[in-house]
Amino acid sequence: MRSKLAATVGAVAVTLVAAAPALGHGRSPDLAFRGQAIVPTGTMFDGTTVGGLSSITYDARRDRYYAISDDQGQLQPARFYTLALAVRDGRLSDADVRLQDVTTLLAPNGLPYPKASLDPEGLVLTKDRKLVYTSEGLPGSGIDPFVRRAALDGSFRGEFPVPEAFRVAGTPASGVRPNLGFESAGVTHDGRYLFTASENALYQDGPAATITNGSPARILRYSLKTGRVDRQYVYVTDKVAEPPVPDTAFSVNGLVELLPLDDDTLIAMERSFSVGAPGTGNTIKLYTVELRGHTAVKTPLLDLDVLGIPLDNVEGMTFGPRLRHGRRSLVLVSDNNFAANQFTQFLLFAVGK
């Protein structure tokens, strides 16, 4: 069955199609796996609990990475970590990860965010050396998602307007679903555009992903010149990869990261999890995405199951430095949910031949 919903945001008309994903045959980059590093759950740094790393971005000037924690202030205030990853030799192991700093994100009033006032998820460094970070919002508490800017010291530096369709409303339900809002953040190399997306469909756009159907998420493209959304795209996720056990247990699949290759081409990451599924229950897939009209057309790039290693809840992705033989690096990171049976995982890939 095929259903169409029309939504207008400002002057932008978007047709949302709850159907099979739009699959393309575009040219995708070659990826070669070069190793992993594990940071155990419970690791402490400078008085904070290291974990929940849901997004990562690379600072080429400093050869450092920034990774945001999705702690809502339950353990410590909202924050991001500065890390060094020794990857230029084309390998990654546990000893190659060094935590260097932790920075508290500050609310517009200049103070740390109050507990349970945001759900920090996406993070990206822009050309003007500001950070953009996203919050999924907390629909159960009536808190809207947001997209904000911060200086590298964590201080508030502005906010991008969020289209009304994403805002939380109760009757009838509309806007982002709980834990299915703005999980991603990516900026084009030329600094013109910022991308983020809902992880699944907005309430008014269709169902969340299940073991039988995908979900029509919305990708937003912001012009960094105007600070406003100038285009929206429909991205239909895959269905949940594995049935949960029992079949009434929790399961999810969603669009968790976007990494621009150019103005119209992205790498998208989907993460599926099912309670009771084999192994860790996680399935992570990468797609090359071409933006055509208002549709995101997916081409399979990599199913991380082929790596043959246990996968945690991988949600973050960034390009890093050139490796020793000239290939560009790609780094992925997992959000361990601060759970004792999970782990923070960094994965290294070489891009190109």
What function would you assign to each model-found segment?
Residues 1-24:
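Secretory targeting and sorting signals
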